[in-house]
Amino acid sequence: MATALVSLEGVLMTEVGDPIPDGVRLYRVIAEHYRTVLTSDMSVQKTDHWLRSNMIFGYADIYDDRYFFEGQDLRHRQIDYAMAQGKVELFIDADADYCAYALSKGIPSLMFANPKFVRSKRPVKPWEDLRSEVERQRLALLDAHLGSSTKRFE
């Protein structure tokens, strides 16, 4: 079964710990068709408690803060760890930077934006970074399918 990586913060939960109903609905649809792995900034005990308290079940695993090394970005490390475990078919997050990082690794990404969630822990980079990554991926795919002009025989 294909694996989907879904972020807890911003997709299922607000910064104060309230569930995001639209995100929970999205998760339930995704969980029917994918092996769903949740990523979290909290410990596995706190994450598991929050999920049980909000009746969210059916996930395969939780990647929490123990996958973090000093000097690394936690979500980047979680994406890399998930890729080391097998093919990741879908990545869902509320942060454009992390979606751009997943795109750069070749993972289809879905950015979930909900007005109930506003990230205040760190400022979000401009949309131009995401646009430039999408354009870079498009050009790489074109080059892979068509080849460069030096390789073509016409």
Give, region by region, the residue ranges found by the protein language model:
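Surface-exposed charge patches
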Residues: 49, 81, 100
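Short, hinge-like loop/turn segments at secondary-structure boundaries
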Residues: 53-56, 109-111, 128-130
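C-terminal accessory extensions appended to soluble enzyme cores
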Residues: 120-154
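Short coil-to-beta transitions that initiate beta-strands within beta-rich domains
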Residues: 72-77, 127-130
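Acidic, Mg2+-coordinating phosphoryl-transfer loop and its flanking beta/alpha structural elements
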Residues: 86-126
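Alpha-helical substrate-recognition element adjacent to the catalytic core
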Residues: 1-73, 145-154
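Short, well-structured alpha-helical segments in soluble
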Residues: 77-86
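Structural motif
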Residues: 29, 82-83, 102
